[in-house]
Curated annotation (Swiss-Prot):
Residues annotated as domain Ig-like C2-type: 20-113, 171-271
Residues found modified as Phosphoserine: 225
Signal peptide: 1-16
Keyword annotations: Adaptive immunity, Cell membrane, Disulfide bond, Glycoprotein, Immunity, Immunoglobulin domain, Membrane, Phosphoprotein, Repeat, Signal, Transmembrane, Transmembrane helix
Organism annotation: Mus musculus (Mouse)
Full protein name: B-lymphocyte antigen CD19
Keyword Disulfide bond: yes
Processing and modification events after translation: Phosphorylated on tyrosine following B-cell activation. Phosphorylated on tyrosine residues by LYN. Tyrosine residues are phosphorylated sequentially after activation of the B cell receptor. Phosphorylation of Tyr-522 is extremely rapid, followed by phosphorylation at Tyr-402. In contrast, phosphorylation of Tyr-493 appears more slowly and is more transient, returning rapidly to basal levels.
Extracellular face of the membrane: 19-287
GO terms, biological process: antigen receptor-mediated signaling pathway; B cell mediated immunity; B cell proliferation involved in immune response; B cell receptor signaling pathway; B-1 B cell differentiation; immunoglobulin mediated immune response; positive regulation of phosphatidylinositol 3-kinase/protein kinase B signal transduction; positive regulation of release of sequestered calcium ion into cytosol
Annotated propeptide span(s): 17-18
InterPro entries: CD19 (IPR042341), Ig-like_dom (IPR007110), Ig-like_dom_sf (IPR036179), Ig-like_fold (IPR013783), Ig_sub (IPR003599)
Location, primary (coarse class): membrane
C-alpha cells in the first residue's frame, strides 16, 4: 500500500497542472465565426495531443493529435477532410486512413498524390501501369507527356512496391470523375489538397479517424487523428493546429469551452449576440441585397428630384431677374404690318412712322403754321369735302399712331385720318391738328380762334407769373405755361406723368357733322395776361370766350 504522502502530492500536482491558467471572453454576433485558440500566439508548435471540452462534459468532443505542420481538418457536409496546403515534392506518396468504428487497426487506401516534375509516380493498381508505358506509339499520339527517368511505385496489398525506373508517360490530364474513381491525384507544386477517407461525400459520425503518409523510401508519418464525441451533435468546424473555428455561430454555441493540452488548460467563454430572425435569414440567404439596393435607388431618386427642383427654381429666378433688368424690355412697341389696321388689345394701332413720313409731317406742320397761325386753340374744326379727305388719306398712310417720346424727329400728334366723316375725340391730352385745312370763316370760329399758339420761335418765353385758381384749373402743384409752350402742341409721356387731372367734358347743343367735340383744348386758360373765362348763356352751351 503506497504511503498517503506521495499520493497526496501527485493529486496536488494534478490539480495545479490541470487548473485553468487563462480565461478569455469571445463575443461574436449571431452568424459570425467563433475563433478559439488553444495556445497563445507566441507558444511554439507542439506535437502534444490536445482535447476540447465543453461545459461540464467529462468526454471531449474533439481530440487531435497534431502531425506535420501545415495540416488541418474540416468537418462538414462532405465528411471529414484532410487539408494540405502548399504541396511540395516530398508530399507525394500514398495516403491511408483509418476509421473506428467500424474498422479497427485496418488502414484502407485513400489517395495517391503525384506532384508534377517530382520524378516519382504512384498508383494503387498495377493495371493502371500499362497506360503509363511510354513507347514510340504513345509518344507519337500526343495524348501522353514523356517523363523520362520517373520512378514508378505501385501499392501491393498492404505495402508499396517499386515497379521500375523505365521511362513512363504521365497523362496530360484526367477528368475529375476518373480521378475520384481511381483515387489517383496529380497536382502542381504549391497547390492545396482536400483528402477524404473514401469517395466523398462521406457521412460524418461520431468516432475517430486517423491519417498516415506512406512513402516507399521514407518512414511512415502519422498526420492527424481526430476523435468526435460528446453529447452535442456534430456540427461544422475547422481544426488548424491548436486553433478551433466554429463558422456561422448560433445561440446553441454559447457557453464555456476548455482546451486541455498536456498539463495546461485554457478556458474560453463564448457569448453570441442574438440577431433578429429576419436579419439572420437575410445574411444567410443573401436576401439583404434586395432592401439595400431598393434603399439606394430611393435615395438616388430623392436626391435627383431635389436637385432638379433646385435647378429649375434657380433657372426661373435667373430668367426673371434678367427680364426685369433688361432695358430693352421696359418699353414695348406694337408694329403690325403697314396699312392693314389690325385690331389688338391696344386698339386701332397702325405702324410706327418712318423717317419719310416724319419729314412729310414736319413740312405739313410748317405750311399749317404759316397759313393758319391760330388753329391750335380751336377745339372744333370743320371737316372738309370728300375730295380733300381722300387726298389727305393718300398722303398719310400711317394714320393713327402712338407718339414716340424722346424721338429725334420731333413729337407727333395723335392723328386718325381713317374716319374723317365722323366726330373725333382726342384722348391723349393734346390738341387736334389738320395742317391741310383751309382757313375757316369768322362764323365758324369760336372764342379760341384768336388765341395764341403754343410756341413761337421768334418770341421769348413768358416769365411764369402768379395765376388765379378756379374750378377748371388743375389742382396740386403749379402749372408752368412755359413747359406747355416747349412742345409743338403735344405733351410727351414724361410731362403727362407730372400733370394728371381730368379735363372738363364740354358738349355743344348744336348738332351737325361739321362740329367736333373735344375737352382737351383749354391750353390758354391759365395765361397770366388773359382774363378769366366767362360762361356764355347764349349761342352755344358749354363754350367760353375771351372779352
Amino acid at each position: 500500500m503506497p504511503s498517503p504522502l506521495p499520493v497526496s502530492f501527485l493529486l496536488f500536482l494534478t490539480l495545479v497542472g490541470g487548473r485553468p491558467q487563462k480565461s478569455l471572453l469571445v463575443e461574436v454576433e449571431e452568424g459570425g465565426n467563433v475563433v478559439l485558440p488553444c495556445l497563445p500566439d507566441s507558444s511554439p508548435v507542439s506535437s502534444e495531443k490536445l482535447a476540447w471540452y465543453r461545459g461540464n462534459q467529462s468526454t471531449p468532443f474533439l481530440e487531435l493529435s497534431p502531425g506535420s505542420p501545415g495540416l488541418g481538418l474540416h468537418v462538414g457536409s462532405l465528411g471529414i477532410l484532410l487539408v494540405i496546403v502548399n504541396v511540395s515534392d516530398h508530399m507525394g506518396g500514398f495516403y491511408l486512413c483509418q476509421k473506428r468504428p467500424p474498422f479497427k487497426d485496418i488502414w484502407q487506401p485513400a489517395w495517391t498524390v503525384n506532384v508534377e516534375d517530382s520524378g516519382e509516380m504512384f498508383r494503387w493498381n498495377a493495371s493502371d501501369v500499362r497506360d503509363l508505358d511510354c513507347d514510340l506509339r504513345n509518344r507519337s499520339s500526343g495524348s501522353h507527356r514523356s517523363t523520362s527517368g520517373s520512378q514508378l511505385y505501385v501499392w501491393a496489398k498492404d505495402h508499396p512496391k517499386v515497379w521500375g525506373t523505365k521511362p513512363v508517360c504521365a497523362p496530360r490530364g484526367s477528368s475529375l470523375n476518373q480521378s475520384l474513381i481511381n483515387q489517383d491525384l496529380t497536382v502542381a507544386p504549391g497547390s492545396t489538397l482536400w483528402l477524404s477517407c473514401g469517395v466523398p461525400p462521406v457521412p460524418v459520425a461520431k468516432g475517430s479517424i486517423s491519417w498516415t503518409h506512406v512513402h516507399p523510401r521514407r518512414p511512415n508519418v502519422s498526420l492527424l487523428s481526430l476523435s468526435l464525441g460528446g453529447e452535442h451533435p456534430v456540427r461544422e468546424m475547422w481544426v488548424w493546429g491548436s486553433l478551433l473555428l466554429l463558422p456561422q455561430a448560433t445561440a446553441l454555441d454559447e457557453g464555456t469551452y476548455y482546451c486541455l493540452r498536456g498539463n495546461l488548460t485554457i478556458e474560453r467563454h463564448v457569448k453570441v449576440i442574438a440577431r433578429s430572425a429576419v436579419w439572420l435569414w437575410l445574411l444567410r440567404t443573401g436576401g439583404w441585397i434586395v432592401p439595400v439596393v431598393t434603399l439606394v435607388y430611393v435615395i438616388f431618386c430623392m436626391v435627383s428630384l431635389v436637385a432638379f427642383l433646385y435647378c429649375q427654381r434657380a433657372f426661373i429666378l435667373r430668367r426673371k431677374r434678367k427680364r426685369m433688368t433688361d432695358p430693352a424690355r421696359r418699353f414695348f412697341k406694337v408694329t403690325p404690318p403697314s396699312g392693314n389696321g389690325t385690331q389688338n388689345q391696344y386698339g386701332n394701332v397702325l405702324s410706327l412712322p418712318t423717317s419719310t413720313s416724319g419729314q412729310a409731317h414736319a413740312q405739313r406742320w410748317a405750311a399749317g403754321l404759316g397759313s393758319v397761325p391760330g388753329s391750335y386753340g380751336n377745339p372744333r374744326i370743320q371737316v372738309q369735302d370728300t375730295g380733300a379727305q381722300s387726298h389727305e388719306t393718300g398722303l398719310e398712310e400711317e394714320g393713327e399712331a402712338y407718339e414716340e417720346p424722346d424721338s429725334e424727329e420731333g413729337s407727333e400728334f395723335y392723328e386718325n385720318d381713317s374716319n374723317l366723316g365722323q366726330d373725333q375725340v382726342s384722348q391723349d391730352g393734346s390738341g387736334y391738328e389738320n395742317p391741310e385745312d383751309e382757313p375757316m370763316g369768322p362764323e365758324e370760329e369760336d372764342s379760341f380762334s384768336n388765341a395764341e399758339s403754343y410756341e413761337n420761335a421768334d418770341e421769348e418765353l413768358a416769365q411764369p407769373v402768379g395765376r388765379m385758381m378756379d374750378f377748371l384749373s388743375p389742382h396740386g402743384s403749379a402749372w408752368d405755361p412755359s413747359r406747355e409752350a416747349s412742345s409743338l402742341g403735344s405733351q410727351s409721356y414724361e410731362d403727362m406723368r407730372g400733370i394728371l387731372y381730368a379735363a372738363p367734358q364740354l358738349h355743344s347743343i348744336q348738332s351737325g357733322p361739321s362740329h367736333e367735340e373735344d375737352a382737351d383744348s383749354y391750353e390758354n386758360m391759365d395765361k397770366s395776361d388773359d382774363l378769366e373765362p366767362a360762361w356764355e348763356g347764349e349761342g352755344h352751351m358749354g363754350t367760353w370766350g375771351t372779352t
